[in-house]
From Swiss-Prot:
This is Protein SlyX homolog. InterPro entries: SlyX (IPR007236). PANTHER family: PROTEIN SLYX. Belongs to the SlyX family.
Amino acid sequence: MHEKLLTLCDCAFEARLIELEMRVSFQEQALTEISEALAETRLIGARNAELMRHLLEELGKVRNTLYEHPIDEPPPHY
């Protein structure tokens, strides 16, 4: 009887261990996916920052070209 009870406990512990191992495996996979998404988001952010810097530089060039001569400046609006 005592051996039978021990075997039932062993089975319950083994089932619980398997369940916990599956959960850890799932969490590791989720963490990997989140890490990859974060890395991709950082790359996109860096590209967007570079694009914004370039566009602001181009805008500055256009402004300089438009207002190169003071005569060409539009009158102030009040």
